[in-house]
């Protein structure tokens, strides 16, 4: 296939995107990629799901951000217009400024449906790892009257911070698998693990495969290995602090976990059943799992408690497989009232405490709740936790869960960050972010941001210096598109990183002797080659000059 780097549709939208977006300086988030565009007649339109959907974000060790999203448009295949789902990638520097003048188009194959899952993570060298599933195996053989490919073949890409496709323009691909719509990836050291599920709907079967890929794009195994041979098994994998993998799944006996090395060899004599229940719900990622900083993991999940009733179960699994919360875990809401959903979890290795956030709907009241545990399984709040925020349905427009959790994070000194969405009426929401002291006896600060919005696909990331939100704004009049937000852990919007102030083009450090010259436009965005007019060129020694082409 002749790969086109950017589509005309994307260019039309990109022209309307912010020219020099950066992190917000107040409580108003920034649109990094707008779905507002101008057509050939000069009329302005707002694109919906087709123009930008399913955003994902991942942070690098040098405080940059990779953003990915998908679009659904058309492409020409042998003179015939076909449907195509594309994945795009953008890198933000630590100031939040896009580093590519236009987003990089990762894949461009005819695909009828976007009913698939892709993934984004960061390699040890700061490159982006992106997985996709598309119609590459079928595109060349489609019938003339076929709108798009009806198959999904998996592929994985590695793209460095210069925009280079390190594993080739088509990545590491497996076109022999044609029903692998769901893909995922994670990184352990210099190894990347690629996971995809290949389904056979004729006999309702599915096999989950895994491949380990070396830093240079070669594979550790001749063929992908079978990870799971069960269509309905729910699983997740967490890399440990010491380079192993914790593999979470379940059986009829309950939720279980096994420790694996990088060759997928079990490190415990048998899997550990850590709860006699397992997940009950409809989310893609069933369990909320975070490392405990000691080689183990903390997990929270939603489980059935009867018809239309749920509770949140919590467990701490030590590095040796022993269970700190007993054989059956602990309930976040330890009382016989069961309508609790959507957990989030954070762990603080410094204080050895766990915070679980969840949404509750009891007696007509929607609330965001929190429960706190020690690593040893002691409740630090009352049995039913503490209410972070709540409202009656009558005051929330009658919408279920007027208060919806977003996430939690740990601050090194023992404080906690809590974020939630306040739904006033349909398509009218806001985010509230709070910092509490360690025992929730004091609100250190509260910020309500992004009022009157309609966000979807929200990702929250907490780091030592700041909390980040990434989402897709869908509301017309609110600059719809891929949106970013940052706030420091001190409640201020001016964030200083531990390793010094932000470095811009005008003050680049002179410690890059083996770096090739790089070209930027006047907005500070990196471009692959000089544009006609004035450009900024950064030399190998770090000096910057303006050059006219």
Which ranges hold each PLM region?
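Intrinsically disordered, low-complexity polar segments enriched in Ser/Thr/Pro and acidic
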Residues: 303, 372, 435, 508, ...
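C-terminal tail/sorting-segment detector
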Residues: 534-549
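Residue-level detector of functionally pivotal "anchor" positions at catalytic/ligand-binding pockets or at interdomain
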Residues: 489-526
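Bacterial N-terminal signal peptides
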Residues: 7-16
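Extracellular, repeat-based ectodomains that mediate carbohydrate processing or recognition
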Residues: 22-500
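Surface-exposed, short loops/turns at beta-strand junctions within beta-sandwich domains
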Residues: 529-531
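Positively charged n-region of N-terminal signal peptides that target proteins for export
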Residues: 1-5, 549
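Sec/Tat signal peptide C-region and signal peptidase I cleavage site
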Residues: 17-21
């Amino acid at each position: 296939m002749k790969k086109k780097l950017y589509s005309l549709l994307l260019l039309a939208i990109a022209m309307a995107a912010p020219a020099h977006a950066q992190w917000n300086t107040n409580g108003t988030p920034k649109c990094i990629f707008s779905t507002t565009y101008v057509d050939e007649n000069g009329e302005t339109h707002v694109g919906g799901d087709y123009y930008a959907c399913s955003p994902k974000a991942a942070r690098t060790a040098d405080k940059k951000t990779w953003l990915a999203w998908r679009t659904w448009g058309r492409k020409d295949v042998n003179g015939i217009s076909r449907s195509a789902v594309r994945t795009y990638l953008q890198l933000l520097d630590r100031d939040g400024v896009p580093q590519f003048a236009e987003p990089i188009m990762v894949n461009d194959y005819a695909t009828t449906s976007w009913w698939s899952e892709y993934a984004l993570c960061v390699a040890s060298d700061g490159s982006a790892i992106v997985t996709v599933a598309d119609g590459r195996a079928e595109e060349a053989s489609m019938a003339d009257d076929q709108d798009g490919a009806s198959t999904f073949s998996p592929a994985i890409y590695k793209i460095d911070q210069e925009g280079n496709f390190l594993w080739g323009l088509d990545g590491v691909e497996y076109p022999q698998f044609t029903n692998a719509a769901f893909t995922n990836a994670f990184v352990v050291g210099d190894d990347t693990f690629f996971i995809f599920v290949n389904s056979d709907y004729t006999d309702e079967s599915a096999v989950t495969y895994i491949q380990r890929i070396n830093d240079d794009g070669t594979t550790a195994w001749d063929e992908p290995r079978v990870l799971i041979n069960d269509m309905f098994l729910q699983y997740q994998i967490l890399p440990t602090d010491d380079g192993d993998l914790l593999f979470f799944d379940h059986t009829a006996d309950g939720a279980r976990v096994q420790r694996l090395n990088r060759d997928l060899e079990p490190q415990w004599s048998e899997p550990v059943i850590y709860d006699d229940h397992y997940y009950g719900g409809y989310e893609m990622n069933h369990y909320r799992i975070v490392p405990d900083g000691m080689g183990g993991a903390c997990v929270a999940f939603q489980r059935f408690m009867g018809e239309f009733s749920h509770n949140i179960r919590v467990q701490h699994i030590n590095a040796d497989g022993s269970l700190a919360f007993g054989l059956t875990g602990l309930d976040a809401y330890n009382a016989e009232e069961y309508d609790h959903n959507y957990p989030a979890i954070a762990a603080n290795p410094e204080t050895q405490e766990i915070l679980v956030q969840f949404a509750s709907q009891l007696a007509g009241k929607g609330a965001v709740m929190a429960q706190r545990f020690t690593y040893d399984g002691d409740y630090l709040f009352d049995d039913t936790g503490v209410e972070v925020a709540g409202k009656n349905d009558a005051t929330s427009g009658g919408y279920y869960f007027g208060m919806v959790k977003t996430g939690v994070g740990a601050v090194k000194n023992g404080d906690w960050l809590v974020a939630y969405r306040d739904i006033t009426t349909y398509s009218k929401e806001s985010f509230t972010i709070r910092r509490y002291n360690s025992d929730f006896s004091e609100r250190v600060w509260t910020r309500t941001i992004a009022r009157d919005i309609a966000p979807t696909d929200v990702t929250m990331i907490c780091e030592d210096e700041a909390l980040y939100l990434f989402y897709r704004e869908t509301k017309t009049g609110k600059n719809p598109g891929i949106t970013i937000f940052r706030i420091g852990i001190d409640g201020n919007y001016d964030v200083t990183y531990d390793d010094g102030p932000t470095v811009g083009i005008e003050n680049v450090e002179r410690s890059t002797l083996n770096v090739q010259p790089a070209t930027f436009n006047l907005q500070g965005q990196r471009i692959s080659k000089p544009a006609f007019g004035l450009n900024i060129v950064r030399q190998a020694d770090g000096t910057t000059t303006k050059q006219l082409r």
